[in-house]
Amino acid sequence: MASEQAAESYTVEELVAVNPYNPDILNDLEGFVNDQVSNQTYNLDANLSLLRLYQFEPERLSVQIVSRILIKALMAMPGPDFSLCLFLIPEHVQMEEQFKTLIVLSHYLETARFRQFWDEASKNRNILDVVPGFEQAIQSYAIHVLSLTYQKVPRPVLAEAINIEGLALDKFLEHHIANSGWVIEKGARSQLIVLPRNEFNHPELKKNTAETVPFEHVTRIFPVLS
C-alpha cells in the first residue's frame, strides 16, 4: 500500500527514469499511451519502456495499446521511432493484420510513395482514426520530404502528397502562405508552390565545413598537431 501511494506521487516520466523495467508500472504506462492519444502528446521513451515490459510479460500485452504506440511512432517521422518500436514487438504479434498494415504504411512513407500511402490508409480508417492528429502529422512529414527535393512544387504533386484537393487545398495554401513563408507562382500547366529555401533544395546555402569552424577551435588544434 505504501509503495502504491509513493508511486502515485511520481509522474509516469519519473517512474520510467527511476526504473523502466519495473513491471509494477506497466498499467501506468498503458494509461499514459491513452493519455498521449487523447491529449495529442508523445513520449517515445515511455512507449519503448512499455514494449520492453511486454517482452518480459507477454501475457499482459495489449494489441490495442501496441497499435496506438506504432501509429504515434508513424506520426513522428522522419524520426526512426517506428523501427525502434517494431524491433521490440514479437514477430508473431507483427503478423496480426493491423500490424502488417502499419508496416506497409511505414514502408510507403519511408519511400515517399504518398499516393499508395493514402490509398492504403483510406482502407484502414478503423485503425488510424482512433489517434487524433494522424492525418495532419503525415501531411507535415510529406511537406518535409518535398522541401528536401523541390524549390518549387507543382500543385498536383503537393495535392497528391498531402491528400488534399480543391477548395480544401486552397485554404491549406492560404494558411501556409500566411504562416510558413510559401509563395504561389503561375506555371505553364499549374500553380507552383515556392517553398522556403533550405540547404537541401538550395545546396548553395550549405556552407563548407571549414567555414563553420570557429577560429578559436582551430587554434586549439594547432598544439595537438605540433
From Swiss-Prot:
Question: InterPro entries this protein is in?
Answer: ARM-type_fold, CSN8_PSD8_EIF3K, eIF3k, PCI_dom, Transl_init_fac_sub12_N_euk, WH-like_DNA-bd_sf, WH_DNA-bd_sf
Kindly give the Pfam families that the UniProt entry links to this protein: CSN8_PSD8_EIF3K
Query: GO terms for biological process?
Result: formation of cytoplasmic translation initiation complex; regulation of translational initiation
Q: Give one GO molecular function term.
A: translation initiation factor activity
Q: Enumerate the PROSITE patterns for this protein.
A: PCI
All residue ranges annotated as the PCI domain in the record? 42-200
Briefly, what is this protein's role? Component of the eukaryotic translation initiation factor 3 (eIF-3) complex, which is involved in protein synthesis of a specialized repertoire of mRNAs and, together with other initiation factors, stimulates binding of mRNA and methionyl-tRNAi to the 40S ribosome. The eIF-3 complex specifically targets and initiates translation of a subset of mRNAs involved in cell proliferation.
Record's family? Answer: Belongs to the eIF-3 subunit K family.
**Subunit structure as annotated in this protein's UniProt entry:** Component of the eukaryotic translation initiation factor 3 (eIF-3) complex.
Q: Which PANTHER family match?
A: EUKARYOTIC TRANSLATION INITIATION FACTOR 3 SUBUNIT 11, EUKARYOTIC TRANSLATION INITIATION FACTOR 3 SUBUNIT K
The protein here is known as: Eukaryotic translation initiation factor 3 subunit K
Q: Which organism is it from?
A: Oryza sativa subsp. japonica
